Amino acid sequence: MAIELLTPFTKVELEVEKKETNRKQVGILGGNFNPVHNAHLIVADQVRQQLQLDEVLLMPEFIPPHVDKKETIDEYHRYSMLKMAIAGIEGLGIETIELERRGVSYTYDTMKLLKEKNPDTDYYFIIGADMVDYLPKWHKIDELVTMVQFVGVQRPRYKAGTSYPVIWVDVPLMDISSSMVRDFIKQGRVPNFMIPHEVLDYI
């Protein structure tokens, strides 16, 4: 399957292949999921299908390293809503390592632990185009890129380029964010079709 790799200077096509048939291919979509919304699910599902991954795990952060004093729903509720949101969806799961470890959720530390725990798994770390621009500031980024393959997905109003190796995947653009969902709820508006109905009922 031909996948585009974009840098500020070049645009080439790569043939993405399974490295070894006996190795598991797993995508990781990290986030606060505050709350989870339909764009999260579309991104996870489309990356899984297009890169032919075995599964994509949604990984809720305990404390995001890049956000200051962000109002965050209790981790129990964020996990419960994620569990409801992915119920019955093929190839999607939840990775709770950062909730269990607690503290600031640095991706390098998390992926180091996951690689040690699952040495026969190749990880694809999924990020939005806005986070691609931020990659140079990530904790131990040069070591991290040797541990995972970054996968970038386009977001409305963001056009990104980077010198780091990123596989770009086209997904339907949905301008939905967790903060938008929270604002709707604060204003007394119902975020129909923005979040799974089970999550809406839970809220």
Where are these regions (language model features)?
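Nucleotidyltransferase catalytic core that binds NTPs
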Residues: 1-202
